[in-house]
Amino acid sequence: MALTLTTPPEVNTHVVTVLAPGPAISGYFKLGSTRNPQGDEISLTSRSLLFNGAPWFPIMGEFHFSRYPRAEWREGLEKMKAGGIKIVSTYVFWNHHEEVEGEWDWAGQKDLRAFLEACRDVGLLAIVRCGPWCNGEVRYGGFPDWVQNSTRWDPVSRWGLRPEHPAYMASVKRLYQQIGSQMEGLLWKNGGPVIGIQLDNEYSGPSNYLLGLKNLAFEVGMDVPLYTKTGWPRMEDAMPEGEMIPLYGAYPDAAWESSVQVSEGLLYNYIFRQQRIDESIASDVNTIKGGEDESHRDQYPFLTAETGGGMFVSYHRRNRVDPRDVASLALCQLGSGCVGMGYYMYHGGENPDGRFSTLQKSNEIGDIFDITIKSYDFQAPVGQYGQIRPHYNWLRRLNDFMGDFGAELARMPSTLPDGAEKDFSNPDNLRWSVRSDGVSGFLFVNNYQRLQRMPAKLNTNFQIVLPGGGQTIPRNPITIPADSFFCWPFNLDLNGVN
């Protein structure tokens, strides 16, 4: 009888070399009051946020109080907390509160103070995005019509710079005074939930405007540990070191883009990478493409404010977000070195009625797209009517993981294999990364791409070369299933056992 020899299948071993991380940098951040009356302290280094001096991995979700019924705030906040959210972020849309100059409305579901008290009562921290310009798919980005169309200062353009005109800045100061009054007694230093504020949004002009807003905020009493800005778009000049913390983002789709095609930028969001920003964000309102200069990236921790929890639907670009689109994108952010996850949106809502107009973006006022007049559901994990979507549960598992292992992850930079960011649109390439402190860590794999089938990867294992020696995982090669994504631990110390 003839003897048949079979050739074993070729093993696809993927290799990465991990170096021991260098020391974190601290001492140059210009923060507000960092301690609360109980003595708890929030601070940061170049690597992560710190809580009482220990690495801290915050998990944040966006929920717009003025877009949701006041009577249902607490239920919505409790759903967020149950989903693993620790911090609530919210916009203060100027035109929701001062549609007519000098007539302020903080009543009902527009009551910021009551919302922050609800956050406190549920046990959630808060970051308030103060504007004056916000976006959020709101009419004029949140500018009241009387601001947008005023002849008392140079025209305020959503497409360009927000000017430093004295009369305009005086109006902004009154807005900040109102917001400061709403937050009085609720700041971190008072024992309240507000640990930070964001100044303006998606600003591309000179840095002195944002610095002026920071000074105004502090002057009217908004003294908080963290002052933030979006890490996009590129500004005219670099923000002075340590003044504001850039927060980043990435989305599964871009309903604001004029094209109906899938852009390369959106494909790029499903790989592990060094670049922190989704360059397609806010391409409708900014002519300057790209994130800010990342040459100083290592001076700041990689925190996000807008990891897409879904996407709104525009008239011309009617996207449908799959739960895996959201969960795998968040995993890619985590595997790329994120040390603080912020979802936009986490809880959907509905635009309030304006006194003189509807309050959504539209072609009628010069926007390049139309969206729904009332709904701001965003296909979020918690929807416009409080409904729980499948990706709520996908993200809850990821949030629980970040909550349990956040302190370890915050000490572990991301390392990418050679060529990880090249030919990223090729579905046959395996997308993976490692986060490690040089001894132990986590392996991240994303074999998923929105709107594109990703084939199984056969006979696969990984060789992780650490300072103390190499490790191959798993010992026996496996097949990575099509359209899958996951993370594995390695060498973790479990009460003395690795």
Predicted feature descriptions by range:
Residues 40, 65-71, 97-98, 102-107, ...:
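Acidic-and-aromatic substrate-binding clefts and catalytic sites of carbohydrate-active enzymes
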Residues 91-103, 108, 136-167, 360-384:
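Aromatic- and acidic-residue-enriched carbohydrate-binding clefts of CAZyme catalytic domains
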Residues 2-87, 117:
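N-terminal carbohydrate-binding accessory modules
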Residues 72-74, 100-101, 129-131, 137-142, ...:
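Short, solvent-exposed loop/turn and secondary-structure capping segments
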Residues 23, 157, 168-183, 190-198, ...:
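Carbohydrate-binding surfaces of carbohydrate-active enzymes
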Residues 121-124, 134-282, 287-313, 332-338:
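Active-site region of glycoside hydrolase catalytic domains
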Residues 59-64, 91, 127-131, 198-200, ...:
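A cross-family glycoside hydrolase active-site/sugar-binding cleft signature
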Residues 73-146, 214-219:
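Aromatic-lined substrate-binding rim segments of carbohydrate-active enzymes
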